From Swiss-Prot:
It comes from the Eukaryota. One of its GO terms (molecular function) is RNA binding. This is Uncharacterized protein C6F6.19. It holds the Pfam family DUF4187. InterPro entries: DUF4187, GPATCH11. GO terms for cellular component: nucleus.
Length: 122
């Protein structure tokens, strides 16, 4: 991720709900890859190690689900999630996804961007 290149660690607690879903999927995918690697290398897991992996997976899911904002964001329809992300980009970062550009100020964004939705840019 871009933040990691700058030396900033992005944790589930600090991430926007949109990124929490992505980060959660990555953690679970990494855990699954680790399980598959052990399975294919024919290294048998002891009951203790298997239990630790199950506990880790449960902890990852529990951590994500304990955040009310994340749970609320994930419960939205995809179109509503997109609206949240588009507004966040505009309000916090002065960026329009459809223009593909960063603006110098809120006034610059209002003057030069036709709107928040894709239809506004046609």
């Amino acid at each position: 991720m871009e933040l990691e290149k700058k030396g900033i660690e992005l944790t589930l607690q600090r991430a926007h709900p949109f990124y929490k879903g992505i980060m959660l999927e990555e953690k679970l995918a990494d855990l699954e890859k680790m399980k598959q690697k052990k399975l294919f290398s024919r290294i048998s897991l002891s009951n203790a190690k298997a239990s630790q992996e199950i506990d880790l997976e449960s902890a990852i899911k529990e951590e994500a689900n304990s955040d009310a904002l994340y749970v609320e964001f994930e419960s939205l329809e995809e179109s509503k999630q997109l609206d949240v992300v588009l507004h966040l980009l505009r309000d916090r970062f002065l960026y329009c996804l459809y223009c593909g550009c960063h603006y110098d100020s809120q006034e610059d964004l209002i003057e030069n961007c036709p709107g928040i939705n894709e239809e506004d840019h046609e």
